[in-house]
């Protein structure tokens, strides 16, 4: 059924198993969106999912971010809480977003492919809230992160961190148990 395919899509995007009630709510939102849009992308589905469950499961948390950009170069100073350990670093990159992502990678080493980086203004004007979508891939596992903020660079950092946190959850769910590992050895 369409609902079953939707449930499978949620799993492939890195969301933990939902209760049947929660899937029903999300599927209804998905159908409403599909009626309005010609194409529904993975990022659209991620927006529909309530990220409340992530708040208790975040390994990586953004504490602070300072960015300078201009004709003389870009650099980001980033502070993260990774499993209760506070770390701070500074990186330069090819633009402010690259600098931010390099900081995150230095503090939390990982090897992912950035498949998508997308920014959308939620409203009009210079004070508009930006929604950033990030899709990363690691060994065939795809994770989509999203965040919104009036500061596009803060939203970018939060979206990337959100994608990493979902990937960490996905790793935990697909890791072999001790029994499975022992049986394989």
What residue ranges belong to the model's regions?
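Terminal or standalone catalytic/regulatory effector modules within metabolic enzymes
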Residues: 1-185
């Amino acid at each position: 059924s369409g609902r079953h395919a939707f449930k499978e899509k949620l799993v492939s995007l890195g969301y933990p198993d939902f209760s049947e009630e929660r899937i029903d709510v999300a599927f209804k939102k998905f159908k409403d969106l599909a009626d309005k849009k010609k194409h529904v992308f993975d990022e659209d589905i991620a927006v529909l999912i309530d990220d409340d469950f992530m708040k208790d499961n975040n390994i990586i948390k953004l504490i602070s971010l300072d960015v300078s950009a201009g004709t003389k170069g870009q650099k980001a100073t980033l502070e993260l809480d990774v499993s209760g350990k506070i770390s701070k670093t500074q990186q330069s990159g090819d633009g402010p977003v690259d600098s931010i992502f390099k900081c995150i990678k230095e503090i939390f080493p990982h090897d992912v492919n950035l498949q998508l980086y997308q920014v959308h203004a939620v409203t009009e004007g210079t004070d508009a809230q930006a929604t950033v979508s990030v899709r990363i891939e690691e060994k065939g596992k795809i994770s989509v992160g999203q965040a919104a903020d009036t500061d596009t660079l803060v939203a970018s950092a939060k979206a990337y961190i959100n994608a990493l946190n979902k990937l960490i959850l996905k790793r935990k769910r697909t890791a072999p148990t001790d029994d499975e590992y022992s049986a394989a050895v």
